[in-house]
């Protein structure tokens, strides 16, 4: 019986490892991006802190922006915008619910390669109770903080796709630089009037 339990446990581990399952909130950051520079206009702002935290959770070593190393990829955080749209109204016409939309733009600079723009968009709804103004403000602050965290997660999840695009770009460059024999000019087969 013990042998059967060990066999089933081993089989379960192999199946989950083989299908690519991984723990929540972790991303397989490419090995070429395990050391990175985080560049932001507001290094102590909420987005910078959230991105820095996500990078560290995923095992990325962060270097100082003023480092002399030029062979390290750089994640540059750009503009953050938060929009608030009315989602529903009370009978008297006052806003009952808002939909908050956070848009974050960033670029990844890979030395010797290209600059890859990435963006993240996070949506959250927020109920507006006019009778609880203080609680409403606190709830909105908590929602915005959570939106920064989700946007940071989305940005980090896009790093593997940037690496794949970089590899494709390198392959296209090598295929265009190889010598190919000249092909005959295209001949039109239509009859002119």
Curated annotation (Swiss-Prot):
**Compositionally biased, Low complexity: which spans?**
174-186
The stretch of residues making up the signal peptide is 1-18
**GO CC annotations?**
cell outer membrane; transporter complex
Lipid attachment locations (N-palmitoyl cysteine): 19
Tell me a GO biological process for this protein.
Gram-negative-bacterium-type cell outer membrane assembly
Q: List keywords of the entry alphabetically.
A: Cell outer membrane, Lipoprotein, Membrane, Palmitate, Signal
- TM ranges are none
User: Lipid attachment of type S-diacylglycerol cysteine occurs at which residues?
Assistant: 19
Give a yes or no for keyword Membrane in this entry: yes
InterPro entries cross-referenced by the UniProt entry: LPS_assembly_LptE
Recorded GO molecular functions are: lipopolysaccharide binding
Disordered, as annotated region? 166-193
Protein family:
Belongs to the LptE lipoprotein family.
State the oligomer form and interacting partners. Answer: Component of the lipopolysaccharide transport and assembly complex. Interacts with LptD.
Q: What does this protein do?
A: Together with LptD, is involved in the assembly of lipopolysaccharide (LPS) at the surface of the outer membrane. Required for the proper assembly of LptD. Binds LPS and may serve as the LPS recognition site at the outer membrane.
Q: Under what name is this protein listed? A: LPS-assembly lipoprotein LptE
Q: Which gene encodes it?
A: lptE
């Amino acid at each position: 019986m013990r042998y059967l339990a060990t066999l089933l446990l081993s089989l379960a581990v192999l199946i989950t490892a083989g299908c690519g399952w991984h723990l929540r909130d972790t991303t397989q950051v490419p090995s070429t991006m395990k050391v990175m520079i985080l560049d932001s206009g507001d290094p102590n702002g909420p987005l910078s802190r959230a991105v820095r935290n996500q990078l560290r959770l995923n095992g990325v070593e962060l270097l100082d922006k003023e480092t002399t190393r030029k062979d390290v990829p750089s994640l540059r955080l750009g503009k953050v915008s938060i929009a608030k749209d009315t989602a529903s109204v009370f009978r008297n016409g006052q806003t009952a619910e808002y939909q908050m939309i956070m848009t974050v733009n960033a670029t990844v600079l890979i030395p010797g390669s290209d600059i890859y723009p990435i963006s993240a968009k996070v949506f959250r709804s927020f109920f507006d109770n006019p009778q609880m103004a203080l609680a409403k403000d606190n709830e909105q602050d908590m929602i915005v903080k959570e939106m920064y965290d989700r946007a940071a997660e989305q940005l980090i999840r896009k790093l593997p796709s940037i690496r794949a695009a970089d590899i494709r770009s390198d392959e296209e460059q090598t295929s265009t630089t190889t010598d190919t024999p000249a092909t005959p000019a295209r001949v039109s087969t239509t009859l002119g009037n």
